[in-house]
Amino acid sequence: MKRIYLLSLFIFSIGCEDNIEKIDTNELLIIASEGNFGSSNGSLSIFKGKEKIQTIDDVGDVVQSITTYNNKLFVVVNNSHLIKVFTITESGLKLPGIDINTNNSSPRELIVHNNKAYFTNYNSQDVKVLDLETYYIEKSIKVNGLPESIVSDGKHLWVAINMNPDYSSANSVVKIDPENNQVINTYEVGKGPQQ
C-alpha cells in the first residue's frame, strides 16, 4: 500500500507543469474597480511589472468597463453617465483626462471600430457613435431593449440585448453595419446573451 501511495505521489508530481507566466516589467496593467453604486468611488489601479505605480480614486459612480485603443484608455462610468478618456504613458495615466457626457444614457460597454468608438447604453436603449478625433457623439443607433455587450467581427458590430425595457430577460443579438450605422438584422438567441 505504501508503494502505491509513493508511486501515485511520484506520478502526480511529475505530471505538474510550471505554468507560472513571467511578468513583463515594461508593460502596464490597468485594473478597474467598479466601486459602490451611488457612491462615486470607482477607481483605477495601474501596475508596471509587480509594482503599483498609480491609483486614481473617485473615477465615478460604477466603473462599468474599460477599453484601450492606441495610447488612450476609455473608462465607461455607468451611473455617472460619462466616458473618461486618459492618455496612457510609460509612467501611467496622464491626468486629468477628458470627460465625455453621455446625456444620462447609462453607458455599458465600448469598442473601437474604424477610429470610432461604439458604446451601448441602457437608459437611451441605443448604441452611440463617438468620433475619436473630436470626442463628439455623432449618432445614436436605436435598438429594441437594453444593450450590453458589443463586439466587432471586423466588418459588422454585434450587440447583445440581454434585457427588455421592463428589465425582464431578453434574447436577441443585433447586427449593425458601421458603414451606415444602421441595424441590419436582429437574431433570436437564448435568454440573456453576453459576449
Where are these regions (language model features)?
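Bacterial Sec-dependent N-terminal signal peptides
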Residues: M1-I23
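Predominantly soluble domains enriched in secretory-pathway, periplasmic, or organellar proteins
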Residues: C16-Q195
